[in-house]
């Protein structure tokens, strides 16, 4: 059962900022492309069984997020009906 995957405006902006920051720290195009692919592959893998990642507890009981951890990023998302909405993408650390 396939889900539709969408980015929130905040998540889109965060991806752009991650790429801009990488470009400021390195000229290694391969590294930048690897990190972009890491985010893209992780996010679009959520189209199948997005419930596999744990719920991230917040102080607000109205909202819940699921938390996916990759090698370099933390991805927070929610599931509504058959749609996965990427809420935030956070860098774990920039070890270049």
Residue spans of the language-model regions?
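Arg/Lys-rich, positively charged N-terminal/basic patches that mediate binding to nucleic acids
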Residues: 1-38
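Conserved protein kinase catalytic domain
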Residues: 19, 40-43, 90
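A generic structural signal for secondary-structure junctions
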Residues: 20-23, 51, 91-94
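Enriched for short, Lys/Arg-rich terminal
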Residues: 26, 66-74, 78-96
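A short, surface-exposed loop/turn module that caps and links secondary-structure elements
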Residues: 41-69
């Amino acid at each position: 059962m396939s889900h539709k995957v969408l980015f929130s405006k905040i998540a889109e902006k965060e991806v752009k900022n991650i790429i801009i920051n990488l470009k400021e720290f390195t000229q290694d195009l391969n590294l930048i492309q690897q990190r972009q692919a890491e985010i893209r592959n992780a996010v679009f893998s959520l189209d199948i069984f997005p419930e596999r990642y744990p719920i991230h507890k917040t102080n607000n009981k109205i909202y819940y997020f699921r938390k996916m951890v990759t090698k370099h990023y933390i991805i927070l998302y929610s599931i509504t009906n058959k749609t996965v909405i990427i809420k935030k993408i956070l860098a774990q650390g920039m070890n270049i």
